[in-house]
Each structure stands twice: as C-alpha cells, then as structure tokens.
Amino acid sequence: MLKREMNIADYDAELWQAMEQEKVRQEEHIELIASENYTSPRVMQAQGSQLTNKYAEGYPGKRYYGGCEYVDVVEQLAIDRAKELFGADYANVQPHSGSQANFAVYTALLQPGDTVLGMNLAQGGHLTHGSPVNFSGKLYNIVPYGIDESGKIDYDEMAKLAKEHKPKMIIGGFSAYSGVVDWAKMREIADSIGAYLFVDMAHVAGLIAAGVYPNPVPHAHVVTTTTHKTLAGPRGGLILAKGGDEELYKKLNSAVFPSAQGGPLMHVIAGKAVALKEAMEPEFKVYQQQVAKNAKAMVEVFLNRGYKVVSGGTENHLFLLDLVDKNLTGKEADAALGRANITVNKNSVPNDPKSPFVTSGIRIGSPAVTRRGFKEAEVKELAGWMCDVLDNINDEATIERVKVKVLDICARFPVYA
C-alpha cells in the first residue's frame, strides 16, 4: 500500500536538496532566457496528479487499453481548448515536445530526401528547421533562407529559392528572430510552387493567443508549438491545423502515434488543458501585452548605452545583442551576467565570426521576468544593470553590486508569492 505522506525530503535527501536549490535559484535569479517561463501552481498540480499512472495509447474514444474514460475527458478538454484558442479545427495535444511535434509533421508530409526550405539557424532559425546536426538536416535536403541587411526576413530571397529548388515544404518560425513574420506572404510563396507551409510558432504562441502577434493558423497547412515558453504551460508540444483536410489530420495523428510516440503523458496533457484555459483569461492578454512592452523598453536602454541590437529593435518578446563591436563573446557575457544572478543565453548573431559554442551575442527575452510582475520601470533598471556588467565584465565589484540589486528586486517580485 502506498501512503500519501510519503515524501522525497525524508526518502531521498540528495535529490531533495537539488530540487530545493533549483527552487531558490529560480526565486533569486532574474530569468531572461527567451524560451523559459514560470508555469502556474495549477499546471504543476495537474502534472503531479495520478494521471501519471495511466497508459492511454491511441486517441479519445479509440484507445488500445481499457480504463481510459476519464483520461479521454482530460485529453478532449485540451484538444477543444487548443482549437478554440488558436482558431483551428484540428489539434493534437500528445507530442511530448516541440521537436517531436515537428518530427511528426515531417513524417506526415514528407519522404526522406525531400527538399525543405527553412530559416538558417545562424540567422534565427531552429535546430529542427534543417540544422545538419538534427534529424531534419540528416533526413531531408535543406535549403536555408535568411534575413536581409536590416535584419528582417528576406522574402524576395525566399521566393527566389523556392522557385529555384521547388521544395515540398517551406518552414516558417524561429528561435531568435525579433520581427513580425508575414505568414500570408509565406503562404503565397508556398502556393506559387505547390509546397506545404508549415509554421513552428513555439516562441510566440502566447503572444498569438492574446492577439499581440499575427496568428499563422489561418495561413499555414500545419502549425506546431510548444506549450511552455510564452504560453507558460507545461513542457510539451502541440499540432494545429485548419481547413478541413481530414486526410491530412489522419496523417498527422498517425505520425504522432504510432509513428513517433507510444503512450501519451496524460498528466502533462492535463497541464496543457489548464494552461490553455488560463490563456483564455483576460489577465493573460494583459500579461502578453506587457511582455511586448517590456522587451521594447529593454531595447531602448541597450541602444542608449551604445549596444547593437540585431534589426535595431523588437516586435515580439525577444531580441539579440550583437557584441562584436564590444569585443565580447556571448560566452563571456552569459557567464558574467550569470555571476550577477541574471540568466541569459549566448547566441549566434548574423555573420558571427565565432563558433556556436562561443558566439558573439546574447539572446534576451521578457516572458519570465514579466511573469514576476516587472513592468517598464523595472526592466529598464534591469537593462541598465546588465550594461553595467557588460561594460565592466572583469570587475567583480561591479558584478557583486548588481547581484545585490538583483536579489533585492527578486525579493520584491517573487515568482511564487
């Protein structure tokens, strides 16, 4: 018999210590990694539920195991909410991650060796959009498109490459691009050569749900997203589509199960259902609007302090600092800011002379810090502290002074009050 009073602290002190230290780290560090966020206690309650015990291979009403009547309700809630939130008529909530959702789309729509047009990783794309180290770059013939001198997506180049290479699929979406994507233009280019348009909206899904960023669902044949990042749910993936192509929907379902995955994680799907409901609340829209405002406010400070921002600004939740002119590497900046309890990630910038393991830039995002309650005044102050560190990257006294300020503001704006 399992007793409800069983706990990790009494049973596994070593593991519990690491968990507690991570809890403290999240409270005492300012999180600026663009792909990270804080999920709600309600989501964590779902993820820690007895739903974790249930195997449920298949889909609601079509399971391979018995005893699925209640997990069917859970999954259907998540499906219905995803469709409502993003204006889709198809949703698959089973992918364990965004990468696995993307893998399922490739599997459903392509054959190995097919040509795919995807955004260059070095210019803002994602590993799963054709990087040679990823399955996408190994299994398919990838033709990369990029950005122009202003830092915006070069649609003329995209159209030219599409006409020349005749890809079977064009991928929209990014991991480090601060502009607004013209989904309609991308669909126009795809239609001109009879290609699929697949959009990975993982980074901006929360902004899209709140109407702060254009929705690709009406334009793309298929859309994927993660359920964390700006959506602030559990770590997982989601596939969406619109247009009533039932054959496509069957292919997508089969590509997730049984092709890519076995049993779905029902406790995570419950967490997704909670997060999707939270994203329908009025306060979620206010939050996402503030995410965008905060990113713009931070950019203003960096520009005024003489730092180069790729594309000169941001139209979403993230931006890149190009540190080439400062003779700093992204690795150095990441480490110095980390010592001041400010977490960012090193990131390649356009025409980066450094390797991806060193880089010449850092990526900064506002979703997590906004979740704490920071508004323009706080993020401007924060950006100023970051400039102080980067201006004096080898001065431990400066870094320590900033760390004290960070600890103070973190105490005033806790993640979980």
Curated annotation (Swiss-Prot):
Needed cofactors: pyridoxal 5'-phosphate
Site (Plays an important role in substrate specificity): 228
CDD domains: SHMT (cd00378)
One Gene Ontology molecular-function label: glycine hydroxymethyltransferase activity
Cysteine-cysteine disulfides: none
Localization annotation: Cytoplasm
GO CC, alphabetical: cytosol
Entries under Gene3D superfamilies matching the protein: Aspartate Aminotransferase, domain 1, Type I PLP-dependent aspartate aminotransferase-like (Major domain)
Pathway: One-carbon metabolism; tetrahydrofolate interconversion; Amino-acid biosynthesis; glycine biosynthesis; glycine from L-serine: step 1/1
PROSITE patterns: SHMT
GO BP, sorted A to Z: glycine biosynthetic process from serine; tetrahydrofolate interconversion
Function: Catalyzes the reversible interconversion of serine and glycine with tetrahydrofolate (THF) serving as the one-carbon carrier. This reaction serves as the major source of one-carbon groups required for the biosynthesis of purines, thymidylate, methionine, and other important biomolecules. Also exhibits THF-independent aldolase activity toward beta-hydroxyamino acids, producing glycine and aldehydes, via a retro-aldol mechanism.
PANTHER family on file: SERINE HYDROXYMETHYLTRANSFERASE
Quaternary structure and partners: Homodimer.
Name under which the protein is recorded: Serine hydroxymethyltransferase
Source species taxonomy: Bacteria, Pseudomonadati, Pseudomonadota, Gammaproteobacteria, Enterobacterales
